[in-house]
């Protein structure tokens, strides 16, 4: 009809509303959109930066500017019950005889020392984890085994080749020349100052005397009696003399090792020779 407006049907389909379920099982209509928490307006830092890493206000000033003192913090309570320690009594009341003595007397359980040192000497405290030298673990390089030929790098016998016998209690190595070949007697040396070579001899059957210990090789200091006549003018020094026991022990060890050295060709000459570096020879490129 003329003059009448025709209503157009809605082509857009309406989305079905989401249903909400109560705890009782009833369905409620409503939107599924969760309520967002309200956020404050973003703002710049309250501590403007003067230079990179340095702010205008100090830490204490920012504490008051942010009103940090208004915040309340509560520490988490531990569920473990603390055991109450029993207090150790410092004094004990003891009965005392006599009419005029008061009947009782308070006595200290921990008495003070009767005598005190005249000088204040600090006590040497052993720190945690540290042990004295006698209790240190003695380690030996994997390349050094009994019978290994070693090159001594320091001392009067430097450059000479010796035979390693065993490791002593102090960690030092017991070596011998033998004395007949290179004039190196039974002596101690540190494993830091030797080069272990790949040349080895079998000394499993060699019997080393048990008394060859650190005390055996320790130098003995000569004690002179004090106030001896003419001691001011005595200029002669007593020379070290080899004891007969040392000579016997040297022969006992060398007599067992020498036959094993002679059994290997060219080993006698190898032990007699002295190790040295010449021009163009670099120690880090050598294979020992």
Curated annotation (Swiss-Prot):
Skewed-composition ranges (Basic and acidic residues): 1-25
Bias-annotated ranges (Basic residues): 26-44
Protein name: Large ribosomal subunit protein eL6
Modified residues (N6-acetyllysine): 239
Gene3D superfamilies: 2.30.30.30
Subunit structure: Component of the large ribosomal subunit. May bind IPO9 with low affinity.
GO terms, molecular function: cadherin binding; DNA binding; RNA binding; structural constituent of ribosome
Gene: RPL6
UniProt-listed CDD domains: KOW_RPL6
Consequence of substituting residue 100 to Q: In a colorectal cancer sample; somatic mutation
Protein source organism: Homo sapiens (Human)
Chain positions covered by the region annotation Disordered: 1-48
Primary residence: cytoplasm
């Amino acid at each position: 009809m003329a003059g009448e407006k025709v209503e157009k049907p809605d082509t857009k389909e309406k989305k079905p509303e989401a249903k909400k379920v109560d705890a009782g099982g009833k369905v409620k209509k409503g939107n599924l959109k969760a309520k967002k928490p309200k956020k404050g307006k973003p703002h710049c830092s309250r501590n403007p930066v003067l230079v990179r890493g340095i702010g205008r206000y100090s830490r204490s000033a920012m504490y008051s500017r942010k009103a940090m003192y208004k915040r309340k913090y509560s520490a988490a309570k531990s569920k473990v019950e603390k055991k109450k320690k029993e207090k150790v009594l410092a004094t004990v009341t003891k009965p005392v005889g006599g009419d005029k003595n008061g009947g009782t007397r308070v006595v200290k359980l921990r008495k003070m020392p009767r005598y005190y040192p005249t000088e204040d000497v600090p006590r040497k405290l052993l720190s945690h984890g540290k042990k004295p030298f006698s209790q240190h673990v003695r380690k030996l390089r994997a390349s050094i085994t009994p019978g290994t030929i070693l090159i001594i790098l320091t001392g009067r016998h430097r450059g000479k080749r010796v035979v390693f016998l065993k490791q002593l209690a102090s960690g030092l190595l017991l070596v011998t020349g033998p004395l007949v070949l290179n004039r190196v007697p039974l002596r101690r040396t540190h494993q830091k100052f030797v080069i272990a070579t790949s040349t080895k001899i079998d000394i499993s059957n060699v019997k080393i005397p048990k008394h060859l210990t650190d005390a055996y090789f320790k130098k003995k200091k000569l004690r002179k009696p004090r106030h001896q006549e003419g001691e001011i003018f005595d200029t002669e020094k007593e020379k070290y003399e080899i004891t007969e026991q040392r000579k016997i022990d040297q022969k006992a060890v060398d007599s067992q090792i020498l036959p094993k050295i002679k059994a290997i060709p060219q080993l006698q000459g190898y032990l007699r020779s002295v190790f040295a570096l010449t021009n163009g020879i670099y120690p880090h490129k050598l294979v020992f």
